[in-house]
């Protein structure tokens, strides 16, 4: 063995149409997947920050102010935790046996938190953080 650590090479042989075989490094794939998920997390984070701004601008007298403030804050907090988990997952080497159990647990935790975040965001959308049309005009603090 090359080192004191046991390493499993997680490579998959993939046949191309010409019959050639190439190796797919699953650790590289997992890292790219984590980076892509992090980018989506950033987009959702920005969206929720804008929703939070909208709720705060409407003020505490809006119908669902406390509910939306709580849901958006919980979603933002979960997204930060998910982002940290994804960075940790991307930094650990899947090829090292001693990391595989930990990576599996971290991946399960991240997946669970993403599911909870999606459910929270469904409720945020249902309660609505944006007023439109004549309702917004009537409740605006800057009359026309």
UniProtKB/Swiss-Prot annotation:
Record protein name field: Ninjurin-2
InterPro entries to which the protein is assigned, alphabetical: Ninjurin (IPR007007)
Example of a GO biological process term: tissue regeneration
PANTHER family: NINJURIN-2, NINJURIN-RELATED
Oligomer and partners: Homooligomer; in response to stimuli, homooligomerizes into filaments. In contrast to NINJ1, the filament is curved toward the intracellular space, preventing its circularization on a relatively flat membrane to mediate plasma membrane rupture: curvature is caused by cholesterol-binding at the cytoplasmic leaflet.
Function: Its role in unclear. In contrast to NINJ1 paralog, does not mediate plasma membrane rupture (cytolysis) downstream of necroptotic and pyroptotic programmed cell death. While it is able to oligomerize and form filaments, filaments are curved toward the intracellular space, preventing circularization to mediate plasma membrane rupture. May act as a homophilic transmembrane adhesion molecule involved in nerve regeneration. Promotes axonal growth.
Domain observations: Composed of 4 alpha helices: 2 hydrophobic transmembrane regions (alpha3 and alpha4) and 2 alpha helices (alpha1 and alpha2). Alpha1 and alpha2 feature one hydrophobic side and a hydrophilic side. In contrast to NINJ1, does not disrupt membrane integrity. NINJ2 filaments are curved toward the intracellular space due to cholesterol-binding, preventing circularization and ability to mediate plasma membrane rupture.
Record topology, Cytoplasmic segments: 95-98
Source organism: Rattus norvegicus
Keywords on record: Cell adhesion, Cell membrane, Membrane, Transmembrane, Transmembrane helix
């Amino acid at each position: 063995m090359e080192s004191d650590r046991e390493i499993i090479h997680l490579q998959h042989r993939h046949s191309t149409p010409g019959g050639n075989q190439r190796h797919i490094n699953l650790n590289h794939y997992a890292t790219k997947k984590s980076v892509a998920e992090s980018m989506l997390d950033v987009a959702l984070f920005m969206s929720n920050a804008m929703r939070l701004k909208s709720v705060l601008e409407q003020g505490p007298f809006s119908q669902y102010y406390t509910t939306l403030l709580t849901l958006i804050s919980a979603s933002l907090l979960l997204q930060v935790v998910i982002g940290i988990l994804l960075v940790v997952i991307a930094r650990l080497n899947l090829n090292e046996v001693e990391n595989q159990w930990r990576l599996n647990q971290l991946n399960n935790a991240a997946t669970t938190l993403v599911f909870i975040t999606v459910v929270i965001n469904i409720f945020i959308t249902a309660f609505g953080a944006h007023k439109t049309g004549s309702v917004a005009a009537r409740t605006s603090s800057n009359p026309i």
